[in-house]
């Protein structure tokens, strides 16, 4: 039926009538009451106004489009137990494209306009002009530099020409003067003048000769320097080439020694091994001529001969260091009490040194020192010695972690590769890759998450009661955390994980056990902190969300508020353009339950979930426990394949044959396919929640892998602890032992949390650091106390309180919980606590000065000093410095202090006393003792 008035139109649009009246008035349609009639023109006017307000073109064509892109990556991080966890990181990118308006069809008469240059062309031309300007500037600078150089050369030439012209003028003038004087003076004076001229000419020639000699000497010196540099370079190059040739030369066969030709080149200075100039049979009676060289002389071409000649020198009678056996080499003549052998192995079995062999060492996760030495073909003592050089004391049977072993291999000159060659688990992956089985559709695995007070348990109970047969309803056991429900459109498997322990463990191991998450939110309560935590878990796992807004039957239910709060947490409903369906349900009346299951199945169809059926089963441990009568019991969710009774399964380090299989109703079953939860018995131990379960071909292989995992886990744990101790030691040494004050902060609102965290982190110094382990909004829960126990942190509650269970747990574990209402009180108390963690400042306070006037030596006591107190006071146990000629000789403590024969606590100025120094007797008369004490002063921030 077409709507004729405002009220009917509002009902059709599912919105309040007063809001519709406001929008009509904004659009220019004057309607005063809900009974006013609406025409089609009024509705078109309202629609055009709303489109204009939301940025949509009037003709209905979209002017902009928004694209969202998600990228999921994985990073690995070690947890507190040392196990490696995979954390998924999702990056979202959003880009909006706006369509520009097309130019109008009707325009003014066509006018030939100048060609339009786009921005890229303008930028290119600007860049070209800038380059041209830079080129012109460089050319101008080069031209200016050349002109300056030419001007300088011309100025120098002009100066030389002027000097030459001046010298010629002076010479001519002197000659004219000399002629005049010669005409005026008698003959003997002319003779004197000629002698003076001769002297001047000789002096000028000598100065020219000296200048030429100096220039020649400078040129000669420069040539000598260049020649010396070139000679040194050639010497180094020759030495390098000779050493390389010697190292790469093949080992020679044993043959009779041939006479060595004399080497004409001078011996190298400063070398220990010098080549022999004589033949081996000749005596060395004549002394060698002394060879002196200002520069480094060139070594012999045959460098290896210098090593061979050592034995010949010793056989000729030349004794070297430690060689007391008449030319025998070695540090000792022979073993104790035995005659010395005349056989020299080095003379006959000499081999040229070969190049070091670099090995590729495969390093597993853990390896002992002995195994690592065997892989590198070296002695274990060499490996232990290298470890000691690296600062780690170890034994031959000590287990090293992979990182330490790889560093050690690199230090010893080999190439290390991380490998798992001895890991029997490699066969599991190979077998899984080879299996090619057809995948069939499977049921979705759904995890129900949300706040405990939002009706999650009631919703699950209603689903059980509605979808499980009446006869089977009483057989449901409450401790099983997984069950499946049959619907007309298919089966759904629900996963109930209280506290989300299994969900977190599965996500950490990179296994995607959950396909869809149902987020339960109460309509009257809204989004709570645990709801935010559930949203974060679901986003980190990368699974779609289906939001169930519960308790819609309550009068205080407000769906719009819940939607707005969820939008603030980046959970956008489909009706607003998001990807999360919102379903209002009531666990009390059952309203909306079918629609919720329908949405879950729709999401499963979109995901196209498939798994192989005819193959060995694989799955995950949902939860496990130790039953008194049945032993280890594990609830397993089969992910692929079919699990049958009697199969040999492996779950982590636990293994065994499936002796019994029960479904969620407690009934015995013989097999279970994909997405079916079952409870199995027969394992050797209780596996961890989230461990991967797989069916093995035989029990022997399962036992081998299980025992290997047990040993590897133990070895890795021990190796990690050892490495952590060493790293912490070096880190503390490097940082000066920085102390940490770990904290967990819980506040009432987000603003208080940010302000408190910022204020406390500003208190960090170089010695004490505030470490905020966790900060969140809400009350203090048991999980916060458990985190505080693990991290040894202090819990600060700002306008929040801990619940009864959290208080009980904190009291049992000794966790300190502090409550504050004023932020400055919290900052002041934390500041005081950090001040108490600061190491006290030590200051010396001088007490007195003592002069030693007599020294008495007593056999059993040592040196006793008879002293006179010059200044201050002397106290027993005080620290002293011994001054000799005003130079500090020793610093220590007083051992005893006496006045006459009685022990004295202190001796004041002007009195005499006797004293002894602790572990020091080198005292003389006239020495002075400076007495002081060290005081510790508390520091503040």
Curated annotation (Swiss-Prot):
Parts of the chain that traverse the membrane: none
Disordered, as annotated region: 170-228, 252-351
UniProt main location, coarse: cytoplasm
Stretches assigned to the tr-type G domain: 441-610
Keyword GTP-binding in annotation: yes
Region (G5): 586-588
Coiled-coil residues: none
GO molecular function: GTP binding; GTPase activity; guanosine tetraphosphate binding; translation initiation factor activity
Domain of life where this protein originates: Bacteria
Annotated spans, G3: 496-499
Comp. bias regions, Low complexity: 256-269
Keywords: Cytoplasm, GTP-binding, Initiation factor, Nucleotide-binding, Protein biosynthesis
Disulfide-linked positions: none
Gene Ontology CC: cytosol
Stretch list, region G4: 550-553
Composition-biased stretches (Basic and acidic residues): 170-209, 271-297
Gene3D superfamilies recorded: P-loop containing nucleotide triphosphate hydrolases, Putative DNA-binding domain, N-terminal subdomain of bacterial translation initiation factor IF2, Translation factors, Translation initiation factor IF- 2, domain 3
Location relative to the cell: Cytoplasm
Chain intervals for the UniProt region annotation (G2): 475-479
Polar residues: bias regions: 299-308
Entry similarity comment: Belongs to the TRAFAC class translation factor GTPase superfamily. Classic translation factor GTPase family. IF-2 subfamily.
Role played: One of the essential components for the initiation of protein synthesis. Protects formylmethionyl-tRNA from spontaneous hydrolysis and promotes its binding to the 30S ribosomal subunits. Also involved in the hydrolysis of GTP during the formation of the 70S ribosomal complex.
Official protein name in the record: Translation initiation factor IF-2
Annotated organism of origin: Herminiimonas arsenicoxydans
């Amino acid at each position: 039926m077409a709507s004729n008035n405002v009220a009917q139109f509002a009902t059709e649009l599912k919105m309040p009538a007063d809001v519709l009246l406001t929008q009509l008035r904004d659009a220019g349609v004057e309607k005063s009451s809900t009974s006013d009639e609406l025409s089609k023109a009024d509705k078109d006017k309202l629609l055009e106004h709303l489109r204009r307000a939301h940025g949509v073109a009037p003709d209905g064509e979209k002017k902009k489009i928004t694209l969202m892109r998600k990228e999921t990556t994985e990073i690995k991080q070690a947890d507190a137990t040392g196990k490696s966890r995979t954390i998924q990181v999702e990056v979202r990118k959003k880009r909006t494209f706006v369509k520009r308006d097309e130019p109008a069809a009707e325009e003014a008469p066509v006018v030939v306009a100048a060609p339009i240059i786009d921005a890229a062309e303008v930028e290119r031309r600007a860049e070209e002009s800038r380059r041209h300007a830079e080129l012109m500037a460089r050319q101008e600078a080069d031209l200016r530099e050349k002109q300056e150089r030419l001007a300088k050369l011309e100025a120098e030439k002009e100066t030389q020409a002027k000097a030459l012209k001046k010298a010629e003028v002076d010479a001519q003038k002197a000659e004219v003067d000399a002629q005049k004087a010669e005409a005026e003076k008698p003959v003997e004076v002319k003779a004197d003048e000629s002698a003076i001229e001769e002297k001047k000419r000789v002096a000028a020639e000598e100065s020219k000769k000296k200048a030429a000699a100096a220039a020649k000497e400078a040129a000669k010196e420069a040539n000598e320097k260049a020649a010396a540099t070139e000679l040194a370079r050639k010497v180094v190059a020759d030495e390098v080439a000779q050493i390389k040739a010697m190292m790469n030369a093949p080992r020679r066969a044993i043959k009779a020694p041939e006479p060595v030709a004399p080497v004409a080149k001078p011996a190298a200075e400063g070398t220990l091994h010098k080549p022999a100039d004589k033949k081996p049979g000749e005596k060395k009676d004549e002394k060698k001529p002394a060879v002196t060289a200002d520069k480094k002389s060139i070594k012999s071409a045959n460098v290896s001969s210098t090593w061979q000649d050592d034995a010949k020198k010793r056989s000729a009678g030349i004794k070297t260091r430690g060689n007391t056996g008449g030319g025998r080499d070695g540090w000792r003549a022979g073993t104790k009490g035995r005659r010395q052998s005349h056989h020299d192995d080095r003379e006959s079995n000499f081999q040229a040194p070969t190049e070091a062999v670099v090995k590729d060492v495969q390093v597993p996760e853990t390896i002992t020192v002995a195994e690592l030495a065997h892989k590198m073909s070296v002695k274990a003592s060499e490996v232990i010695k290298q470890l000691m050089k690296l600062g780690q004391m170890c034994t031959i049977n000590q287990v090293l972690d992979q990182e330490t072993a790889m560093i050690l291999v690199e230090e010893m000159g080999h190439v290390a590769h991380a490998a798992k060659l001895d890991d029997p688990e490699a066969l599991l992956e190979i077998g899984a890759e080879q299996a090619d089985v057809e995948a069939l559709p499977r049921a979705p695995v759904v995890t129900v998450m949300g706040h405990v007070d939002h009706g999650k348990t009631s919703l699950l109970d209603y689903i059980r009661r509605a979808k499980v047969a009446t006869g089977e309803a009483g057989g449901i056991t409450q401790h099983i955390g997984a069950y499946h429900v049959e619907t007309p459109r298919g089966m759904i498997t629900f996963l109930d994980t209280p506290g989300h322990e299994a969900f977190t463990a599965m996500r950490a191991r990179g296994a995607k056990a959950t396909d869809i998450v149902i987020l339960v939110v109460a309509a009257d309560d809204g989004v709570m902190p645990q709801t935010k935590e559930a949203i974060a878990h679901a986003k980190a796992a990368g699974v779609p969300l289906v939001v169930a807004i519960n308790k819609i039957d309550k009068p205080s239910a407000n769906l719009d508020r819940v939607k707005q709060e969820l939008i603030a947490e980046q959970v956008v409903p489909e009706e607003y353009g998001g990807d999360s369906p919102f379903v209002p349900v009531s666990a009390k009346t059952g309203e909306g339950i079918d629609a919720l299951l329908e949405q879950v199945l729709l999401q499963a169809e979109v995901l196209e979930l498939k798994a192989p059926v005819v193959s060995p089963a694989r799955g995950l441990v949902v939860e496990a426990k130790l039953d008194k009568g049945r032993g280890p019991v594990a609830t397993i969710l089969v992910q692929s394949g079919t699990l049958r009774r009697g199969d040999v399964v492996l779950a982590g380090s636990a293994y065994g044959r499936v002796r019994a299989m029960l479904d969620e109703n407690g009934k015995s079953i013989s097999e279970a396919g994909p997405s079916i939860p079952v409870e199995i018995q027969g394992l050797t131990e209780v596996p961890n929640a989230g461990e991967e379960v797989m069916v093995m071909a035989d029990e022997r292989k399962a036992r081998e892998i299980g025992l290997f995992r047990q040993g590897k886990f133990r070895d890795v744990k021990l190796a990690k602890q050892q490495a952590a101790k060493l790293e912490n030691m070096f880190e503390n040494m490097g940082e000066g032992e920085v102390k940490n004050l770990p904290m967990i902060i819980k506040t009432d609102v987000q603003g208080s949390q940010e302000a408190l965290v910022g204020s406390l982190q500003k208190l960090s110094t170089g010695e004490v650091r505030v470490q905020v382990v966790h900060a969140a909004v809400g009350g203090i829960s048991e999980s916060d106390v458990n985190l505080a126990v693990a991290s040894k942190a202090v819990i600060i509650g700002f306008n929040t309180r801990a619940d009864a269970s959290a208080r009980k747990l904190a009291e049992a574990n000794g966790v300190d919980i502090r409550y504050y209402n004023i932020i400055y009180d919290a900052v002041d108390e934390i500041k005081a606590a950090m001040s108490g963690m600061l190491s006290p400042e030590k200051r010396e306070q001088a007490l007195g000065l003592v002069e030693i006037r007599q020294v008495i030596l007593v056999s059993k006591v040592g040196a006793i000093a008879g002293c006179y107190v010059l200044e201050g006071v002397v106290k027993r146990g005080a620290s002293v410095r011994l001054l000799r000629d005003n130079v500090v000789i020793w610093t220590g403590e007083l051992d005893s202090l006496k006045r006459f024969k009685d022990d004295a606590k202190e001796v004041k100025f002007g009195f005499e006393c006797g004293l002894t120094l602790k572990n020091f007797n080198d005292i003389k008369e006239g020495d002075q003792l400076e007495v002081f004490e060290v005081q510790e002063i508390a520091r503040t921030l």
